[in-house]
Amino acid sequence: MALLSSPLCEFGKKMPEFVLKDLNDKSFNSKNLENYDGILIFFICNHCPYVKAIIKKLVMTALDLKKYNVISIAIMPNDTIRYPEDNFENMKKFSEINNFSFPYLIDHDQDIAKKFDAVCTPDFFGY
């Protein structure tokens, strides 16, 4: 994803529904999130210098949010042909190296990123 300005927060906006593959190649359905008090969706990728700069803090924040029954979900929307560092195997490595405690999902065709109006990485959405 290119470097762009994210749109302003739209309070009260309904979260777009999605089904994406996780790192175990299993489907993750957003309809199964109703038992949480909050949802943090963040669009990240492995190669982005901005993501690399905040990843440790992001992982710690996701752990802290669990205490408040808030689930964090990472979505990787990049074209893995153009950015091989973001491919599925490298997503697994990135997740392991950084001790992700949250789902890391792949959005192969950027359909979900478009539904969220995500325009860059990292890009954050709270519900």
What residue spans do the PLM features occupy?
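Structural microenvironment flanking redox-active thiols in thiol-disulfide oxidoreductases
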Residues: 53-96, 112
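Loop/turn elements at helix/coil->beta-strand transitions in domains of secreted/extracellular proteins
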Residues: 37-38, 68-70, 100-102
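N-terminal "domain-start" segment that seeds a small globular fold
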Residues: 1-31
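Short, internal strand/loop/helix patches
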Residues: 92-126
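Short active-site neighborhood of thiol/selenol oxidoreductases, capturing the structured segment around
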Residues: 30-54, 58
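Short loop/turn microsegments at loop-to-beta-strand junctions
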Residues: 15-16, 39, 121-122
